[in-house]
Amino acid sequence: MPTLEGIDLTCIRGDRKLFSGVNFLLESGGLMQVQGPNGSGKTSLLRMLCGLASPAEGEIRWDGTQIRSLGGDYFGAMTYLGHLGGVKDDLTAIENLRISSALGGVDLDERKAHDALQHMGLGGRELLPAKVLSQGQRRRVTLARLLVCGTVLWILDEPLTALDTSAVKLVQGLIERHLEHGGMIVMTTHQEIEIAGAAIQRLQLT
């Protein structure tokens, strides 16, 4: 299984250095929780890992090779869920899931989309426009992608935001199963998360 490695990463925004000298190594079955106060660069680091930004210094390697030189071989193995979710108000829950999956390279039929949304506790709401859903329900629509994406690396920015206790347990279950099958996860969260059988690696940004 591949590894994800950060080597001496530096992030600069404007005239401010958010972090420097960041190193980590994530292996199969591993979960890395990125921690730090607001403005410390947590989201910036995740954006680097998914190719939306570049480090001012340092390298990010996937199985020993810089991610920029891998192109689709890396990006096709990764799913990124940002903290905003990307749910479109005028589309139904099922349309949102199918379109976001298609953008990630997954041709999702309506039956599988329905099953994923039902698993996330949205049974009966699949055909409702997203604008009538609560923030927690909209977040569940976004997180349903994890059931259908089929990628080894998940990069999750505040996945537990706006979720109630039952939804948090659902997400914890998804994470546990993904790690049990050799998946890898990098995530930020302001909440403590307990994952059965997982050694959580914590990366502190200051």
UniProtKB/Swiss-Prot annotation:
One of its GO terms (biological process) is cytochrome complex assembly. The keyword Nucleotide-binding applies. It is a peripheral membrane protein. ATP binds at residues 36-43. One of its GO terms (molecular function) is ATP binding. It is found in: Cell inner membrane. Its EC number is 7.6.2.5. It holds the Pfam family ABC_tran. Its main location: membrane. It comes from the Bacteria. PANTHER family: ABC TRANSPORTER I FAMILY MEMBER 1 (PTHR43499:SF1). The complex is composed of two ATP-binding proteins (CcmA) and two transmembrane proteins (CcmB). Belongs to the ABC transporter superfamily. CcmA exporter (TC 3.A.1.107) family. This is Cytochrome c biogenesis ATP-binding export protein CcmA.
